[in-house]
């Protein structure tokens, strides 16, 4: 799985969806109380599986009022990983990985050119669902998250609200960050990648027609 994520970053870099140190991803299997996340500051086109950070998820409960709480810890993984820090978008990945209960959950964050350009021009990404059947059939688009400072808890909270994560399920496949990028969620790296690819293709068509 991690090897596949590395392949995806090479593909995203070759397509111009990210520059060398952009983008991030995380992977978790439902039965595991940990997940893997890309490190900060690494050239993503040269990502290797041993570079990922391994993050433990600890679950607890409060009685008053009754609610679950989650904490995290960095776990040992590889010697290479030990010298790296988790992605700056950790709050967003942790927020999604601790709540979604799909058997496998993959979260990809990229900066696809035409999709970001479409949002910059004020195009409502959700409105494209009604105009292009390949979107409405295969990719559900969440309401765009307004411009929020990256690598913040505020952005993480807005992401979960827009994707409508509730009782372990996520309603949408992809969400746009205004003037920033997108986050796609699915059960495999390539399925998440295809949501980004599909939306990017449609945005390119729309912008070319204007």
Which residues are covered by each model-predicted region?
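Glycine-rich flexible loops
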Residues: 1-210
């Amino acid at each position: 799985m991690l090897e596949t994520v590395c392949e995806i970053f090479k593909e995203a870099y070759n397509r111009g969806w990210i520059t060398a140190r952009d983008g991030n991803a995380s992977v978790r299997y439902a039965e595991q109380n940990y997940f893997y996340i890309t490190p900060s500051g690494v050239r993503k086109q040269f990502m290797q599986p041993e570079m990922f950070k391994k993050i433990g998820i600890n679950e607890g409960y409060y009685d008053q009022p009754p609610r679950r709480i989650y904490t995290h810890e960095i776990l040992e993984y590889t010697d290479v990983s030990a010298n790296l820090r988790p992605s700056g978008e950790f709050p967003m990945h942790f927020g999604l990985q601790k709540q979604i209960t799909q058997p496998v959950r993959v979260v990809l964050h990229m900066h696809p050119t035409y999709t970001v350009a479409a949002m910059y021009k004020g195009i409502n990404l959700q409105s494209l669902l009604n105009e292009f059947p390949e979107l409405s059939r295969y990719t559900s688009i969440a309401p765009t998250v307004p411009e929020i400072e990256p690598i913040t808890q505020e952005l993480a909270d807005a992401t979960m609200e827009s994707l409508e994560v509730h009782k372990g399920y996520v309603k949408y496949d992809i969400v746009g960050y205004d003037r920033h990028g997108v986050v796609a969620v699915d059960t495999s790296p390539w399925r998440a990648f295809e949501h980004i690819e599909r939306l990017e293709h449609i945005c390119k068509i729309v912008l070319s027609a204007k």
